[in-house]
Amino acid sequence: YDKRHLFRMGNEHERFSMGKSRVVMDYKGWKIMPLICYDLRFPVWSKNKFQFNKYEYDLLIYVANWPSVRSDVWKSLLIARSIENLAYVAGVNRVGIDGNGVEHTGDSGIYEPSGKPLFLLPPDEEIMATQLLSYEALQQWREKLNAGLDWDDFTIDY
């Protein structure tokens, strides 16, 4: 996956070129879409698709470098992406102080399609954890609230 939205405040646009395609991987029957950091702020880029009574993906994974001063935004957007896409969302964020003295508290977690936190890691801890996701619970939620049937169909030209 190539990161679509380059973080101008970090001068990424001077060192990298933006990606032009999305990737959805299949792992043990789960459709997974990886995204990077700043892409979280752009809901159109991560918009789940619903065609032929199937969703494009089941899990969004954001690997990120969000500083602690924006941790509330980070968490709010993860919740929003889970609700609007009827998918699990995992946010994996860095911990510690970077080379510029910017603090990162992590605030990593997994959110259910309802937006409810399923698993939250404690802030400021370098930790590795696993969480079992229920495909059955995901399908039940989608059947209960199948908003995909009413989503607008649109395309993005690059």
Report each predicted region and the residues it spans.
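Catalytic-center loop of serine/cysteine hydrolases
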Residues: 150
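Active-site catalytic loop in hydrolytic enzyme cores
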Residues: 1-58, 69-76, 134, 140-147, ...
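CN hydrolase (nitrilase-like) catalytic-core segments centered on the catalytic cysteine
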Residues: 41-128
